[in-house]
Structures are given as structure tokens and as C-alpha cells.
Amino acid sequence: MTTKADKSDDGKVRGRYLLKLSGEAFSGGGGLGVDPDVVHAIAREIAAVVRDGSEIAVVIGGGNFFRGAELQQRGMDRARSDYMGMLGTVMNCLALQDFLEKEGIDSRVQTAITMGQVAEPYIPLRAVRHLEKGRVVIFGAGMGMPYFSTDTTAAQRALEIDAEALLMGKNGVDGVYDSDPKTNPEAVKFDSLSYGEVITRDLKVADMTAITLCRDNKLPILVFELLAEGNIARAVKGEKIGTLVGDQGSRD
């Protein structure tokens, strides 16, 4: 199992990937809002990969603004707080789009909730056409429905655009561990895992709905450190970084 893309005669890497970015990464350190320097750095990484020939679609979380489940714990209605989180993802999408355009990369934001003044509606075939033309497509507003995470959105969008793999860029962690490496210095990192191992061990790769969706459709997941320079390019090229989750639990 591999995420390695093909090289064409001109030496460029070919392949279509769905990149899932955590909203917390956009804040530059787990705070609230958007850190322009961090978003610009991410945009530069994506731009380099697109120039090298890959087709990239993006789903961004909204945790740097709102988390529906956490707001629910503070007494808010879950559905309403989830919608607030969806709107937060759109703010992140627009920030990334702005910096991609500054890098000379055409991009389109498509949202699951209609907001015609700032984004296109989510239309899968149109998204694929954009990708084929070398544009980055950024999917916002989650699934457009409460109770679905942006991890699940990323898996669903990846399948619908026929992506080769789901690349999950994490903030501050370089793969999947058997326990939290931030609190346990003895935590062991996995090089690869099967979908079943992730589910039975209850490893915090993504929510179980997303993992099950990937398992049922044999979509590989690569979990890696987002903010390490050059890591998005390494992920697309199939280099051994992070943790690869797939059918066999092996990179062979």
C-alpha cells in the first residue's frame, strides 16, 4: 500500500490528493483566529506541490474559531453550535485562498452551505474540472449538516473527487502514537496501521465515521506533521513520513 504518485515524462509528479488541515494549525499555536504567517507558509507548501503537477483539494477544520461539541458542553444547542463551526471553516478557507492567490495559484472555495458572494456551491463535477485545470479547490462549511466532523467531510470529499489518498496534516504531532506523545515521553509512533487496528485500539487518527468510510472504500490515509517545511511535498511523493493507514497495515 502506498500513496506514491506517478511521474510523467516531464519529471513532474502526477496525482490527486485531498489535504485535511486542522483549524488549530491556522492559529499558529492553538489559540483563536488566524495567524497570517502560518497560513502563508502552508499556502507556499501547497503552491509548490501544485506547480510540480499534483492536483490538490483541501478541507480545513474550524477549531481555531468554534468546536460544536465543546460549545454543546457549555450549554449551547449542538446543531446550532455545529453551524457556527461550519462558518468558521469558511473563514479559514478564504484566508488560505487569499494566500494561494498571492503565490500565483488559482483556487476556488466551494461550500456546502450556499453563500454566493464569497464561494461557489459544492458541485463535485465542477470541483474535478477545477482540479484538472490546475486550480486548488478548498471545501468549506463541512458537510453542511450538524453532527458530522470535518474529518468525515474530508473522507467523503476525497472519495467523491476520486482522490488517491487522504493526507491529514496535524498540528504538533508527526504521526499516530499508541498514546499522547505530548503527555507520555515513552509513546511509540506507528509507521503504518490497518483500518481495523485504528478502530480496535481507538487510536485518535480521526473520528470513527471517517475511518470506516475510508476502510469501506479502501482510501489510504497518511497522518503527518503539517508545519514541518516540505512535508506536504514529501507526502505527495510517497516518502516515508508520518503514519500510513490502509488495508494491510504496511507500506509495501
Swiss-Prot record:
SUPFAM superfamilies named among the record's database cross-references: Carbamate kinase-like (SSF53633)
Activity regulation note: Allosterically activated by GTP. Inhibited by UTP.
Family in the record: Belongs to the UMP kinase family.
Organism taxonomic ancestry: Bacteria, Bacillati, Actinomycetota, Actinomycetes, Kitasatosporales
Gene Ontology cellular component annotations, sorted alphabetically: cytoplasm
Statement: the UniProt record of this protein carries the keyword Cytoplasm: yes
Subcellular location: Cytoplasm
List of residues binding ATP: K20, L21, S22, G23, G63, R67, N171, Y177, D180
Record protein name field: Uridylate kinase
One biological process term in Gene Ontology: UDP biosynthetic process
InterPro entries, A to Z: AceGlu_kinase-like_sf, Asp/Glu/Uridylate_kinase, Uridylate_kinase, Uridylate_kinase_bac
Keyword Nucleotide-binding: yes
Ranges for region Involved in allosteric activation by GTP: 28-33
The enzyme's E.C. designation: 2.7.4.22
Membrane-spanning segments: none
Top EC class of this enzyme: transferase
Function, as annotated: Catalyzes the reversible phosphorylation of UMP to UDP.
